[in-house]
Amino acid sequence: MDQPAVGDCIAHFTLQEVRPLAEYQAVGYRFVHASGMEVCFVENGDNEQFFSFVFRTLPEDDTGVAHILEHSTLSGSRRYPVHDPFITLDKSSVNTYMNAMTYPDKTIYLASSPLPKDFDNLLDVYADALFAPLLRRETFEQEGVRLVDDGKGGHWEGVVFNEMLGSANDHDSIVARGVSRSLFPDTCYAYESGGNPISIVDLSWERYKEFYRNHYASGNCRLLVYGNNDMRKILDMLDARYLHDAPHTEPLPAPRRSTTWKPDARVRFLAPKEAGGKRGDASVVLGWATEPADDSLSILTLNTIVDLLLDDPSCPLYKALLDSGLAEDISPESGMIADLRDMTFLVGFKGIDPARADEAERVILASLEQICQEGIGREAIESSLKRARFKQQEITGSVPMGLRILSRSVHGWMDGKGPFATMETAPVLDLLEKEIAKDCRYFEHWIEKHLLANHHRVLVSVVPDERYLVEQKHELDEKARAALNEGTKEENRRFQAFEDTADDPRVLATLPHLALSDLPLEIVPDAYDERSVAAVPLWWRKQFTCGIDYVTLAIDISDFTEEEYLPLTLYSRLLTMTGCGDLDSRAVSLAIKRLFGGFNVVTDSASDMRGRTNRGWFFVQMGFLSQDRDEALDFAARLLLGADLADPARIKVALGDLKGDFADSINYNATLFASQCASSVFTEAAQDAERLGGIVQWNWLAGIKESDYAALGKRMLGIQKLLCQRGRLVVGATSGDGALVDALSRFLGHFPAGRSQEAGRPFTLLRPDEHLKRTFALPSNVAYVSQVCRTPETTDRLQVAQTLLSQMLATGWLWNLVRMRGGLMALTPGRT
């Protein structure tokens, strides 16, 4: 279609604004429909098309109604009245992203695909689900909550109910929720938008439908569409099917600001207690309400302050809290939250005696005062801004570009400033640099104004309680007993009949889908050249990278003994947290931030195609600007060869940081831990993965005492010598500039010749006729189960059938059994 001009009307949508978006090589168009709906197109040549519907959803209680609607709107609609069109569609889609998410004050539905027909299918099904959902009682009971008469007093089931039994009881989630609830007590942020299990069971089907009517009107909807799209086709579809006869409605107002908050408040919350937990397992966090989240400069300012103060243990505030000795680590919730109307800044301790809460507050405030007095430092600021420029320049593929744009745009758009107000990052970086040039103490002044002199703050203590889960279960059981009546069994039979009734094949056939003929037949090869540089194998790929070099150093560790292998996860963490030669840990941290857009160290292992020969690899992944390549590679060689890995103080910091990450992730990633543990008895590669990142690794870390640090440091230095041998190295590199190859030759020349020992590590694998069950206790009312079976070799033709079987289980019979009927919150069949 011809490019529209401001004032043009297409399908009752009037074009209100056109904006060039140089950062995305795009043009932006903002349309407003007569019904009040706004649509923003970000048009460019990107074939990965993306869309996202956004509704302002303001909770008024802890029932999680917005979360339940997020699940259930996608479970049957006027055009597609099947049980689960979302999953049925996924069976024949090549989407690169498909999801829905509930935030504290909004709900987002989003998807992307590189195929135009697939994109159209996704948009078609999503639009019908959102504007014409069936909202059946059975869907509410399946996705939300239902009472089951089990003959033992009754119990509750439902997908969201079960999900929140896990996540709402997570210690760190209680910390973050406690801060928001206490800072904004008379607003929607005082409630849990995801739902609290105790309150979820109070939600009725009628209240659920009422919430939909109040929050899903067209005037309360914003739609972002990104990529190489047909604007007229999309606008015509929306108007013809859903908006043509819709009355004009205004968007719901932005959440009101709190007026009843108490200055310098102190609150205390309880959380589940782990078996064997101690009094010092509490969290104490200080949280502030700062500036509105609808201004890009304010968001970038606070984001940069978080990076400067808390990015790693060498940063001044992070270091000050660790040096205080009050706790094992800082709280993982430390940082900023920009998803509320006012941004919040949180910082505090985890693993602290709650009786020391006042002392914790004094340490935090005194540390901030000292930082402002001494200054953050020009080098730190320049390094942080350079990293921000790198991220803005980089072409990433980890998430769709449309999702990145949405995450920026939504701040200003939802507060009435339009979709472009907070969409671009480059102009805001320019503005921030100008502000710093005008005021060399720009960040210190912000801290003094918005933190030290700001009494809209709260000190939150979260204390583990061994009765927490018991009392929660007791209250839920009491509510179940009180709600049971003579009609409950009949309600259960009605629900089961609905679940047992298969979708009519003729109705299923109405769902749009892809055929094999819709898929491109051409396979784009991942082309690279195999070379040798400084006697090291090099996999070289030359392509446009926007002026960035990418280098992966792969170090063969297949011959490492178990004593050398187990410490590698800690080694990886310690490498970037310690000093090197005349550089202390802070100087190393700043050099990494200044020279590299990314510097990651990971360990992995893999079998050959038949699953027989195990190879372990220690990877160093680097990304840097081409103009910095010589300095970056020289520094990388210096760090890998000369990092001070025997420093007991840095070992303590790295160990605490790593243990904190394990403890924080165990509930959220419990299914992954279970799968990894169960898989570890089948192949050497899986057993190595368990050693490095599973329960075996956790037990090894938990067993390290402070008296072990000296011996551990010696072991780390021995590992360093083993790793840094040229005979172990393989390099992968990608750049638009062939001069990188010469730079790599100089880089590799720093490494001494040498090769492997013959030892290796033992493996204990399951015999073909053997079965094994293992159970671990968690502080949760939710169970996480993984079952792993032996399969044919990768080269066996049965693997093709097995791949298809995994997809069928994930979207078919097994999904229906455990999710649709059983109310499980997750099911992830797959093969390795």
Question: Where on the chain are the PLM-derived regions?
Answer:
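Catalytic Zn2+-binding segment of zinc metalloproteases
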Residues: 72-82, 578-583
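Hydrophobic, small-residue-rich alpha-helical packing segments that form membrane-like cores
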Residues: 146-220, 224-242, 246-273, 278-280, ...
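Short beta-strand/turn micro-motifs at beta-sheet edges
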Residues: 39-42, 96-99, 210-212, 271-275, ...
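His/Glu-based metal-binding/catalytic segments typifying zinc-dependent metallopeptidases
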Residues: 42-45, 52-54, 161, 165, ...
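M16 family metallopeptidases and their MPP-like homologs
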Residues: 47-58, 84-132, 139-147, 173-198, ...
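Non-catalytic terminal extensions that flank enzyme cores
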Residues: 1-50
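Active-site His/Glu-centered metal-binding helix of metallohydrolases
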Residues: 65, 69-73, 571
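C-terminal regions of mature proteins
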Residues: 2-4, 227, 384-542, 669-767, ...
